[in-house]
Amino acid sequence: ISWPSYPGSEGIRSSNCQKKLNCGTKNIATKGVCKAFCLGRKRFWQKCGKNGSGSKGSKVCNAVLAHAVEKAGKGLIAVTDKAVAAIVKLAAGIA
């Protein structure tokens, strides 16, 4: 897996990441998960910099992890949406 290209200082911003993933637009409950993901992603890029070596070649900064972080966003939000929908359905059944 090749190291994903550095998204740039604007690209790693949590607000931009949230916009890209449409955080909380379909369901407010997903906003928290989305925000947490985007903040984690931002910290990852801040730590790992442009080439994945970071300071002292941190073990955190490897291509596999970076690739996973970039790909995880959409899947994470989709799973959360499903979970929220299930909870809402369940709550409606109880009420």
Curated annotation (Swiss-Prot):
Annotated localization: Secreted
Organism name: Cerebratulus lacteus
GO term, biological process aspect, one: killing of cells of another organism
Chief location: secreted
Function statement: Permeabilizes a variety of cells. Forms large pores which allows the release of large proteins almost as rapidly as small organic molecules and inorganic ions. At sublytic concentrations, the toxin also inhibits protein kinase C and endogenous voltage-gated cation selective (sodium, calcium) channels occurring in the nervous and cardiovascular systems.
Family: Belongs to the worm cytolysin family.
Keywords: Cytolysis, Disulfide bond, Secreted, Toxin
Keyword Secreted: yes
A cellular component term, taken from the record's GO annotations: extracellular region
Disulfide partners: C17-C38, C23-C34, C48-C61
UniProt GO molecular function: toxin activity
Identification of the protein by name: Cerebratulus toxin A-III
